[in-house]
């Protein structure tokens, strides 16, 4: 028994002795990797664990996972496309709406006011120039009267008189034409009124807008009240209690000859 135990312990010690020489081999490796780490470079990571067996592509679970990943990738791609399209549309809208900024509106308003003021000023200048031209045309240029002789003054006065005479004649002709046109317009208006009939607008009074509505409602209520449409019957055949007239007793009427006796008594009295 003791010999058997020794034989079993001897082979177990051999592997332990074989494992001891591996320690010095690990030391140089550690010494060789420590120097690069001291020079500022990180030590390489430990070797990864050995990968498991490769997955079978024909496995239904693997196929389902791949299909799920592909579907998720397609959904993400479509979402990205929609997001990009919406961003582009919003940018386009902002670019269109944001063209007339408050500053641009203010500048445009100032330019329009400036242009309107310039146009108004030009129109006033044009009217003033036209007025001066008409005055010069009708009245003529002023004459130098300080150095003029008596004969020249008379000629100037006669010229002004003739000009005034012509202007008055033209004025009278124009007024006559205006009166004539006014008369023709009034005559035509009278003819038009005669043809279509002159309509005089009557004086309107204020009426409540709810009055007609209330009348319609009352009319509808009366239509639905069927008792109002029934005829009144004066016969008392269908009354529950018939009222009997009070009859006088026979003794109060008296005998048939009592009336004649009463008349004779009254005649004698």
From Swiss-Prot:
Residues 1-104, 239-269 are annotated as: Disordered. The modification N-acetylalanine is found at residue 2. All isoforms are expressed in somatic muscle. Isoforms containing exon 6a1 (isoforms 1 and 2) are expressed in all muscles but highest expression is in abdominal muscle and splanchnic muscle of the gut. Isoforms containing exon 6b1 (isoforms 5, 6, 9 and 10) are highly expressed in the tergal depressor of trochanter (TDT) muscle. Keywords: Acetylation, Actin-binding, Methylation, Muscle protein. Pfam families: Troponin (PF00992). GO terms for biological process: adult somatic muscle development; cardiac muscle tissue development; heart contraction; heart development; muscle cell cellular homeostasis; muscle contraction; muscle organ development; myofibril assembly. GO terms for cellular component: striated muscle thin filament; troponin complex. The keyword Acetylation applies. The modification N6,N6,N6-trimethyllysine is found at residues 201, 205. Residues 162-171 are annotated as: Troponin T-interaction. GO terms for molecular function: actin binding. Binds to actin and tropomyosin. This is Troponin I. The lineage of its organism: Eukaryota, Metazoa, Ecdysozoa, Arthropoda, Hexapoda.
């Amino acid at each position: 028994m003791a010999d058997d135990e020794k034989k079993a312990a001897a082979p177990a010690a051999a592997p332990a002795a074989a494992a001891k020489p591996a320690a010095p081999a690990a030391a140089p490796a550690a010494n060789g990797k420590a120097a690069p780490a001291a020079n500022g470079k990180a030590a390489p990571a430990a070797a990864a664990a050995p990968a498991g067996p490769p997955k079978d592509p024909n496995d239904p679970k693997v196929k389902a996972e791949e299909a799920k990943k592909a579907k998720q990738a397609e959904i993400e791609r479509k979402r990205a496309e929609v997001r990009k399209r919406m961003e582009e549309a919003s940018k386009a809208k902002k670019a269109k709406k944001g063209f007339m900024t408050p500053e641009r509106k203010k500048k445009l308003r100032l330019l329009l006011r400036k242009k309107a003021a310039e146009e108004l000023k030009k129109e006033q200048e044009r009217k003033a120039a036209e007025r001066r031209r008409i005055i010069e045309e009708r009245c003529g240029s002023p004459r130098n009267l300080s150095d003029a002789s008596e004969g020249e003054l008379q000629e100037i006065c006669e010229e002004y008189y003739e000009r005034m005479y012509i202007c008055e004649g033209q004025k009278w002709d124009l007024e006559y034409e205006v009166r004539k046109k006014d008369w023709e317009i009034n005559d035509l208006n009278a003819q038009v009124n005669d043809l279509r009939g002159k309509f005089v607008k009557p004086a309107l009074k204020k009426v409540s807008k709810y009055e007609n509505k209330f009348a319609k409602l009352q009319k509808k209520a009366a239509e639905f009240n069927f008792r109002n449409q029934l005829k009144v019957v004066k016969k008392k055949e269908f009354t529950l209690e018939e009222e009997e007239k009070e009859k006088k007793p026979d003794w109060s009427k008296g005998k048939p000859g009592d009336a004649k006796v009463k008349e004779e008594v009254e005649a004698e009295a």
